[in-house]
Swiss-Prot record:
Pfam families with a match to the protein in the record: TPR_16, TPR_19, TPR_8
Protein's gene: NPGR2
Species whose genome carries this gene: Arabidopsis thaliana
TPR repeat ranges per the UniProt record: 90-127, 162-195, 215-248, 465-498, 500-533, 536-569, 592-625, 626-659, 697-733
Keyword list, A-Z: Calmodulin-binding, Repeat, TPR repeat
SUPFAM superfamilies the UniProt entry points to: TPR-like
Single GO MF descriptor: calmodulin binding
Tissues where this protein is expressed: Expressed in pollen, flowers and fruits.
Quaternary structure and partners: Interacts with calmodulin in a calcium-dependent manner.
Protein name stated in the entry: Protein NPGR2
Basic and acidic residues biased stretches: 33-45
Region described as Disordered: spans on this chain: 32-71
């Protein structure tokens, strides 16, 4: 076939391939190699007419896959030629770089891409994207026809160069040059962001290929900054990806939101709070990493519920972690409740909700959910649910019997399959047995349950500091102080140095042994081990120990230090973040107790005005406090105002009928009055006090006074026994309750 007989489009295609090969050689080869390849090209041109039917312009040695790649890129080149009448240097490099990248020749591709003058073509690309083809941007030609100003670069060329910049970033990434890769990738976003600001939205989003490259670049940039060990730039890139209008599809946006939330939670880099350019007044602005992550994950869950994105269980896992460390488990429970029913099994939902409410301090709500679970015949979480229910019941004296039943069922379900769960079950069983012993009707039953509870605890995992701490607590409350001290020390050895309650118990046991200096040494050691915000309870105990040693001025000084700490703590947290409900309650209780302790000190010093001042501060915190009304009654009693004292004690019992100090104080005043007809009332008050707290030495002492007032021989004998019990208990009484 002669050259004249070859169809024009075939000749055009052959010339185009030849041009591409020459440009490719210029990009990849040295000068000598280039001359050698040009000679080969001339030889191949001589036989082009003869060989056309049986071969193509490509070498027969090239693989079929390479042919497909070249054909695709030639089509790109032809499209560029149609739009601009020429294929310029940058576009040719973009095409050839893509060919090398697709073949896996990363270093060769990078050499080609580095030949593109990015700075030189940036302005042209921005101009091409911002040109509008509407009427107000058109101009009149001489013939009166309306023509659009043609940009220096076509949209297709812009798309081609965007892809080249993106592939350059990917090449740098694969070669481990992450900083350069991120800077290259950022160029795409900078160009588009500037163009969008000038109203080029339709030009960007209207081109499918360009939008696809932009989406990939937006998603890649934060990952590159993370690889470059630049977390702050990664955070800024994530925010840029989510706050700008890139027209990303929902799934891509969801992926970016999830990855950003994960980075905020686990990277260890504290992000600066976002400075939002446009926000409605009163809108929520996250103040730290956790809040920002929670916001992102909650948005993702809402999209899942609205079926805008597919379900991803990891979202819920990360949100559970974030809300747990934020101390807002009630909010986590709400998120679970709002999930679509088909996403979670009903039994799993109830079990998770019960965990949330238990962690939030709403044990009774959790128990109600668990009771619903137990009605199911087949529940995979049954054993763990039984243990949780038993623990909840064990913390409430009125539900101890129910908790005992749950614990025994859990042990029965386990058998010998899981030693760890068996140890946990025996731990919970020990707690419920010792708690239920307090409600025992007879002394025999009480002792039997206490003994069984101790045995259950000792059969639990004795390498667990929580188990050993519980044994120390039970022995301390039974006044087995030597055993309690040994267990408390063992708990510290097992790794409970960070557990404030173990330090407190150890110091309280020492104070019960009247070793006040040793107890203060333990408190000082604990102060060195704990953080500043956790020192409140330790400082209060230290003040009580100093008071027990007769160091009243030092005790008042320590209380003043504690109040200053509480004031600073309250202001700091109020300005920084929302506190968990339980923590706020604990702070208020600690401040309230401090004012009450100071009031007692000033009453003993007969400084009535100072005592009244402390009680006034207490009233501001809790207007209806049985403890405060009891202290007011003590103040009136010390001043000889018995009627006012009786009224204060009565008010305290109206607020809390089980307030033991008010029961004993009211009985004491009735005994002082000396009305024999009131003996029955005194007896009822004291017996109720001992039913609630059988180790209260003041109740035993006043009961002895009551028997002595009766005057009979048998009553005198009972009085002696009561006085002996009171003395024994007072000798082993800690400066503050063991729990």
């Amino acid at each position: 076939m002669k050259n004249s007989e070859i169809r024009p489009e075939k000749l055009h295609l052959r010339k185009l391939r030849k041009s591409l090969r020459k440009i490719r050689m210029k990009c990849l080869c040295s000068g000598e190699q280039m001359r050698h390849r040009e000679e080969e090209d001339k030889k191949s041109e001589v036989g082009v007419g003869r060989d056309y039917n049986g071969s193509s312009a490509l070498s027969t040695a090239e693989s079929e896959n390479a042919k497909k790649l070249d054909n695709g890129n030639i089509e790109e080149a032809e499209l560029s030629l149609r739009e601009t009448s020429s294929l310029n240097y940058e576009e040719a490099r973009a095409l050839l770089g893509r060919i090398e990248y697709q073949k896996g020749n990363i270093e060769a591709a990078l050499r080609v891409f580095e030949g593109i003058d990015i700075n030189g073509i940036t302005v042209k690309m921005k101009t091409a994207l911002t040109v509008r083809e509407d009427r107000k941007h058109r101009r009149r030609s001489k013939g009166g026809f309306s023509t659009a100003p043609s940009p220096a670069m076509s949209k297709h060329a812009v798309s081609l160069l965007f892809e080249a910049i993106f592939l350059k970033a990917k090449s740098l990434q694969r070669l481990g040059r992450f900083q350069e890769a991120a800077e290259s990738c950022r160029v795409i976003l900078d160009i588009v962001e500037t163009s969008l600001a000038e109203g080029a939205s339709d030009n960007v989003t209207g081109d499918i290929k360009l939008q696809e490259t932009l989406t990939k670049a937006v998603e890649l940039l934060p990952e590159l900054w993370k690889l470059a060990d630049s977390p702050r730039d990664a955070i800024l890139s994530y925010r840029r990806a989510l706050l700008n209008h890139w027209k990303l599809d929902p799934e891509t946006t969801a992926r970016i939101q999830k990855e950003y939330a994960v980075f905020l939670l686990y990277s260890g880099e504290e992000a600066v709070p976002p400075n939002l350019r446009s926000q409605t007044e009163g809108s929520f602005i996250p103040r730290n990493n956790v809040e920002e992550a929670i916001l992102l994950l909650m948005l993702l869950l809402r999209k899942v519920n609205l079926k805008r994105i597919s379900w991803d269980a990891a979202i819920l896992d990360h949100l559970s972690f974030a809300l747990t460390i934020a101390g807002d488990l009630t909010a986590l429970a709400k998120q679970f409740e709002e999930l679509s029913p088909e996403l979670l099994d009903q039994r799993e939902l109830y079990h998770t909700l019960s965990l949330c409410y238990q962690g939030a301090g709403e044990g009774l709500v959790a128990l109600g959910l668990l009771r619903k679970l137990f009605s199911e015949r087949e529940d995979p979480n049954r054993t763990s649910g039984l243990l949780m229910a038993s623990k909840i019941c064990g913390e409430r004296s009125g539900l101890a019997e129910e908790g005992l039943d749950y614990a025994r069922k859990a042990i029965g379900n386990l058998g010998k399959e899981c030693s760890q769960l068996d140890g946990a079950a025996r731990f919970v069983l020990g707690i419920t047995l010792t708690e239920s012993s307090r409600m025992a009707v007879t002394e025999t039953e009480r002792i039997a349950r206490q003994s069984e509870g101790i045995q259950a605890l000792e059969s639990a995992d004795m390498t667990n500091p929580r188990v050993v701490h519980r044994l120390a607590l039970e022995n301390a409350e039974q006044r087995k102080l030597d055993s309690a001290l040994a267990y408390a020390k063992e708990a510290l050895k097992l790794g409970a140095e960070s557990d404030l309650e173990v330090w407190l118990l150890l110091a309280r046991v020492l104070s019960a042994q009247k070793r006040f200096s040793d107890a203060e040494t333990i408190v000082d050691a604990a102060l060195n081990e704990t953080g500043k915000w956790e020192q409140g309870k330790l400082l209060r105990l230290k003040a009580k120990l100093r008071l027990a040693k007769g160091e009243v001025k030092d005790a008042i000084k320590t209380y003043t230090q504690l109040l200053a700490l509480l004031q600073v703590q309250s202001k700091s947290f109020n300005s920084a973040k929302k506190l968990p409900k339980g923590y706020v309650k604990e702070l208020m209780s600690l401040e309230l107790g401090t004012w009450h302790d100071l009031a007692h000190i000033y009453i003993n010093l007969s400084q009535w005005r100072d005592a009244e001042s402390c009680l006034s501060r207490s009233r501001l915190i809790a207007p209806y406090s049985s403890v405060r009304y009891h202290i007011e009654g003590v103040l009136y009693n010390r001043r000889g105002q018995l009627e006012e004292a009786m009224e204060a004690f009565t008010t305290a019992l109206d607020i809390d009928p089980m307030h033991v100090p008010s029961l004993t104080s009211k009985a004491e005043i009735l005994l002082e009055v000396g009305n024999r007809s009131g003996i029955a009332v005194v007896r009822s008050f004291l017996m109720e006090a001992l039913r609630i707290d059988r180790l209260n030495h003041s109740a035993w002492y006043n009961l002895g006074k009551m028997f002595k007032a009766e005057g009979s021989v048998s009553s005198m004998q009972e009085a002696v026994e009561c006085f002996q019990a009171a003395v024994t208990l007072e000798e082993t009484m800690p400066v503050e309750p063991f729990r």
